[in-house]
Regions:
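ATP/NTP phosphate-donor binding region
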Residues: 1-144, 151, 155-158, 165, ...
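Catalytic core of DAGKc-family lipid kinases
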Residues: 2, 96, 118-122, 128, ...
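ATP/nucleoside-binding phosphotransfer catalytic cores, i.e., glycine-rich phosphate-binding loops
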Residues: 2-7, 23-48, 52-53, 70, ...
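Eukaryotic intrinsically disordered and solvent-exposed regulatory patches
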Residues: 67-73, 127-129, 138, 160, ...
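Structural signal for hydrophobic/aromatic residues that build the beta-strand cores
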Residues: 83-88, 126, 141-142, 147-149, ...
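Eukaryotic basic, amphipathic alpha-helical target segments in cytosolic regions
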Residues: 108-116, 134-138, 149, 161, ...
Length: 463
């Protein structure tokens, strides 16, 4: 869902972005990017800085580390700070670059946030970039797209030889895709009202300007075929995954694609047979594992999944096993929102050290399921006390689809349907968030004050 290309469309070459710092309304802002210039295709990027000459390099000395690897980052980004912005120009409605110039760049200028802008060209481009990037140059990585691009960034960081240090680089989510669940959750944690589109982007940009950091959890997933995947948001199987993946063809509608996809899927409601097991929070606390299980002894690329045993073995005796049956959906959720208007986990901002497990058993009527999803906008779906809907806070789970039926969606990205298990790692990643001590820095103004045009015109770009 809105990864590097927002699908499999041809990507846009990484190009120098015209239009100066603080000049979102310059005559160059509508310049097209799809040029054939070899230098642009080689990956020229845009640089901006808080008030100064157009395109001037940042004042930060290159190569200076901005965090202590032994302690990780502090609770606040420095002022001024330098960030790397990874932006998918084709995600969602295809307006991310325009939104960056008009909504994000002016606020960053006021807040002394310098940036370098890189446009992704294809699926997994962001993953490749962060895998090879010299992270010590940046105070934070800013991801402007949907949830899929953040998924790429996190997995790219976890694939680095220095993953233990790399994953502690602060991350920031700026919504510009069709799926913006992580940004909506951070907006909720900051105490803002539930909003969408440009209003959500404004709120998340203000969070970056305030520089506050908060730790969030990471979900480690392992499949029967040996894949290890890391998730920032969710794993879905059944109805939610079907809607997420099958509505990709409507992604130009933005988040309306999910409403349309839900209605279409309700017409022909599917059920999937499988087995589910999970480790409830209370059992994890009372019966913590004494040692690392065998599956981690030869896998040191990532944190130890101490609650998991190999998929070939039965789950431990203190786990809860749901008998094999037909499910409409299974959803494992780390955060409050599944979309900007889907308040799926109103039980609390974040369950400390846990994740939300929902499943809906077969037998639920289409009308009831529709009512649940409509009530989810305000987080009131649990008030229905629907006997087919089950919710449990867990720290680990195992899900085994029968005969590989159905689709998995991890952070909105399709994953092969096979047996999978996962464990949450609490407070593992630092995110720009509204949770923390108030910043002494002045609040950026929105709309930003008008600024005099730069005297030096922006550089010419071959189109």
């Amino acid at each position: 869902m809105d990864s590097a290309t927002g699908g499999n469309d041809a990507g846009t070459p990484t190009a120098r972005v015209p239009g100066g710092e603080g000049e979102p309304h310059s005559p160059y802002r509508d310049a097209r990017l799809g040029c054939t210039d070899k230098k642009l295709k080689a990956g020229v990027t845009a640089e901006g800085s808080a008030p100064g000459a157009l395109g001037s390099p940042s004042q930060r000395t290159p190569g200076v580390k901005v965090m202590d690897p032994a302690r990780g980052p502090q609770k606040q980004l420095p002022r001024p700070c330098l960030v790397l912005v990874l932006l998918n120009p084709r995600g969602g409605k295809g307006k991310a670059l325009q939104l960056f110039r008009s909504h994000v760049q002016p606020l960053l200028a006021q807040a002394d946030v310098s940036f370098r802008l890189m446009l992704t060209e294809r699926q997994n481009h962001a993953r490749e970039l962060v895998r090879a990037e010299e992270l010590g140059r940046w105070d934070a990585l800013v991801v402007m797209s949907g949830d899929g691009l953040m998924h790429e960034v996190v997995n790219g960081l976890m694939e680095r030889p220095d993953w233990e240090t790399a994953i502690r680089k602060p991350l920031c989510s700026l919504p510009a895709g069709s799926g913006n669940a992580l940004a909506a959750s951070l907006n909720h944690y900051a105490g803002y009202e539930q909003v969408t589109d440009e209003a959500l982007l404004n709120n998340c940009t203000l969070l970056l300007c305030r520089r506050q950091l908060a730790p969030v959890s990471l979900l480690s997933l392992r499949t029967r075929s040996g894949l290890r995947i890391f998730s920032m948001l969710s794993l879905a199987w059944g109805f939610v995954a079907d809607v997420d993946i099958e509505s990709e063809k409507f992604r130009r509608l933005g988040e309306m694609r999910f409403t349309l996809g839900t209605l279409l899927r309700l017409v022909t409601l599917r059920v999937y047979r499988g087995r589910l097991a999970y480790l409830p929070v209370e059992q994890a606390v009372s019966k913590a594992p004494a040692a690392s299980p065998p599956l981690d002894r030869q896998d040191r690329q990532g944190p130890v999944d101490a609650h998991l045993v190999p998929l070939e073995e039965p789950v431990p005796a203190h786990w809860t096993v749901v008998p094999e049956q037909d499910f409409v959906l299974v959803l494992v959720q780390l955060h409050s929102h599944l979309g900007s208007e889907m308040f799926v986990a109103p039980m609390g901002h974040r369950v400390a050290g846990a994740m939300h497990l929902f499943y809906v058993r077969a037998g639920v009527s289409r009308a009831t399921l529709l009512r649940l999803f409509l009530a989810m906008e305000k987080g009131r779906h649990m008030e229905y006390n629907c006997p087919y809907l089950v919710y449990v806070p867990v720290v680990a789970f195992r899900l085994e689809p029968k005969d590989g039926k159905g689709m998995f969606a991890v952070d909105g990205e399709r994953m092969v349907s096979e047996a999978v298990q996962g464990q949450v790692h609490p407070n593992y990643i630092w995110m720009v968030s509204g949770r923390g001590d108030p910043s002494p820095a002045p609040e950026p103004q929105w709309p930003p004050p008008s600024r005099k045009p730069q005297q030096t015109p922006p550089p010419e770009v071959s189109l």
